[in-house]
Design a protein with these regions (language model features):
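Substrate-recognition "cap/lid" segment bordering the active-site pocket of phosphatases
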Residues: 71-119
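A structural signal for isolated positions on well-ordered beta-strands in alpha/beta enzyme cores
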Residues: 62-64, 90-92, 122
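Non-catalytic pre-domain segments flanking phosphatase-related domains
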Residues: 1-20
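Short, acidic loop-to-helix structural element flanking the phosphoryl-transfer center
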Residues: 34-64, 71-76, 104
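Glycine-rich phosphate-binding loop signature in dinucleotide/nucleotide-binding domains
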Residues: 12-13, 59, 113-120
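Acidic, Mg2+-coordinating phosphoryl-transfer loop and its flanking beta/alpha structural elements
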Residues: 110, 118-149
Length: 149
């Protein structure tokens, strides 16, 4: 079988969780530049992704939000999430000043904080490079929008 697709095995002793990207996936930052952190409070909720995430949470999945946003905007990000997502979540953010690519940052967070603690049933992401990275880890990744940037 030349087209074998690697999928990570589940550990039945671990809780199930989903990974969800923020910008371009759950949060739509219309009218702001990516680094305009003072404006993220005005982002629109991508209601279709939010509906799926809420449904998975109701079925017992932990919701893990993983973003390339700098840690400096944690306050406004959690304020937006609490007002818009309205379910329990765990939030991982890029360390302040970390200039590495999103895929590098998210892979490191996954390896250090998430991989041995949860069965990741699904990942929601928009950026091609990050989608590819998740799939290389054997995770089912749903790409929610065009992400060639």
């Amino acid at each position: 079988m030349g087209n074998y697709r690697y999928m990570k095995e589940f550990d039945k002793n671990l809780p199930n969780a989903v990974l969800v990207d923020l910008d371009g996936t759950l949060a739509l930052g219309k009218g702001r530049e990516w680094f305009d952190y003072d404006k993220v409070i005005n982002d629109q909720l991508e209601f279709r992704v939010a509906h799926i995430v809420r449904s998975l949470q109701q079925q017992g999945h932990k919701i893990i939000l993983i973003t390339g946003r700098d840690e400096e905007c944690r306050g406004v990000t959690t304020e937006w999430l609490d007002a818009n997502l309205t379910i329990p979540y765990i939030l991982y953010m890029r360390s302040h000043g970390d200039k590495r690519s999103d895929s590098e940052v998210k892979l490191e967070i996954y390896k250090q904080e998430i991989e041995k603690e949860y069965n990741i049933t699904t990942v929601f992401e928009d950026r091609n490079k990050v989608v590819d990275m998740w799939r290389q880890q054997g995770l089912l990744c749903c790409q929610v929008y065009y992400g060639d940037f």
